[in-house]
């Protein structure tokens, strides 16, 4: 497991701007990675790490299908302030994690394998799990297995029954997702549209999501999405049935 320790948080003066305070409070205490394994090769799974590394039990927060671990920055910062260790991974092909060689590996068994590698690297006997959509699905699978280290689980935007209409909509959105954007603002406007179910969020949060959803590519003079379009492989065929777990 690899750790890169960020700069320690500095005390802010009374005159510090709200933007500066926001940026500092949303800086992870550590950033690290573990190695996952597919049938063909190893790959790097990146994560942010908040709070005390010696906390008795870690909280693992796992994002939805096209998102990344920085979605949980606000929650992670708040929980770390209460003495918890919070780890937020990027699933393969998202955020700072490596993309997979074979697009067919973007599937639930691989995600569960990668998260098991992360749990083992953390060394926590017990963990709490917070999962959104796909992250919740992974959590349910891991929590249901004998000997699971998952002791408590909080899930949203997912359940044991997945209606086919929702799967169709998700697949359509994924296939139509832009690969790059001219500006951060363009990325933000796109996210505001496709993530409208997130609810009424403040402007600073939408901006935060956008900043961590793209990466500037100087050779192409554009912002590239930090989501591998090949994850759409699972939706290559139309869904004509609901999924009952």
What are these model-derived regions, one by one?
Residues 61-64, 88:
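Structural cue for short, hydrophobic secondary-structure segments
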Residues 66, 91-95, 160:
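Alpha/beta-hydrolase active-site loop signature
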């Amino acid at each position: 497991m690899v750790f890169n320790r960020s700069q320690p948080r500095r005390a802010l003066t009374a005159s510090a701007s709200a933007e500066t305070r926001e940026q500092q409070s949303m800086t992870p205490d550590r950033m690290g990675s573990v190695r996952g394994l597919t049938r063909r090769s190893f790959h790097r799974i990146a994560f942010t790490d908040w709070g005390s590394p010696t906390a008795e039990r870690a909280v693992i927060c796992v994002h939805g299908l096209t998102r990344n671990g920085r979605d949980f920055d606000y929650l992670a910062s708040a929980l770390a302030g209460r003495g918890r260790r919070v780890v937020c991974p990027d699933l393969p092909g998202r955020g700072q994690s490596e993309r997979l060689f074979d697009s067919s590996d973007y599937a639930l068994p691989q995600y569960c394998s990668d998260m098991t590698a992360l749990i083992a690297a953390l060394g926590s006997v017990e963990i709490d799990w917070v999962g959104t959509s796909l992250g919740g699905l992974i959590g349910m699978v891991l929590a249901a297995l004998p000997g699971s280290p998952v002791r408590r689980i909080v899930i949203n935007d997912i359940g044991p029954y997945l209606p086919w209409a929702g799967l169709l909509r998700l697949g359509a959105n994924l296939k139509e997702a832009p690969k790059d954007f001219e500006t951060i603002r363009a990325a933000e406007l796109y996210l505001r549209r496709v993530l409208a179910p997130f609810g009424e969020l403040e402007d600073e949060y939408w901006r935060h999501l956008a900043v961590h959803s793209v990466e500037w590519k100087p050779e192409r003079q554009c912002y590239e999405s930090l989501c591998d379009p090949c994850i759409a492989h699972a939706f290559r065929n139309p869904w004509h049935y609901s999924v009952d777990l």
